[in-house]
Amino acid sequence: MSDPIKLHDLRPAPGAKKAKTRVGRGEASKGKTAGRGTKGTKARKQVSAAFEGGQMPLHMRLPKLKGFKNPAKVTYQVVNVSDLEKAFSNGGDVTVADIVAAGLARKNQPVKVLGNGEISVKLNVTANKFSGSAKQKIEAAGGTVTEAK
């Protein structure tokens, strides 16, 4: 019985690993043109990936982007009056923190209340913004509206 094979004794079979040809390193081994043929752009330098053989390239065919992104834009978390009625059916005071705790909006972002749906519960709502119809519906139900800064 022979010795067991050890990991450090493993070698590739003879001829299994062929050394890569180093081109352009002397006349004997693919020197001079190094497999690029003779003359022409591709023999002299690398052609850029954007070059399309003289056709108008894609990045020049497409239109430029116009306009800009307003850095002062405020994106509000939207909550409807009907959502407030479902979440706070007992009535009372409702703040932005309460709306976030109820899972109606994300925290650390301003909240705007919109007037979609109906409300019959008396709520004293404090939020960052209100639509006109939301104000009317909340006040018609006997509640109050306060805009927080």
UniProtKB/Swiss-Prot annotation:
Residues 1-44 are annotated as: Disordered. InterPro entries: Ribosomal_uL15, Ribosomal_uL15/eL18, Ribosomal_uL15/eL18_sf, Ribosomal_uL15_bac-type, Ribosomal_uL15_CS. Pfam families: Ribosomal_L27A (PF00828). Keywords: Ribonucleoprotein, Ribosomal protein, RNA-binding, rRNA-binding. It comes from the Bacteria. Belongs to the universal ribosomal protein uL15 family. Part of the 50S ribosomal subunit. This is Large ribosomal subunit protein uL15. It comes from Corynebacterium jeikeium (strain K411). The gene is rplO.
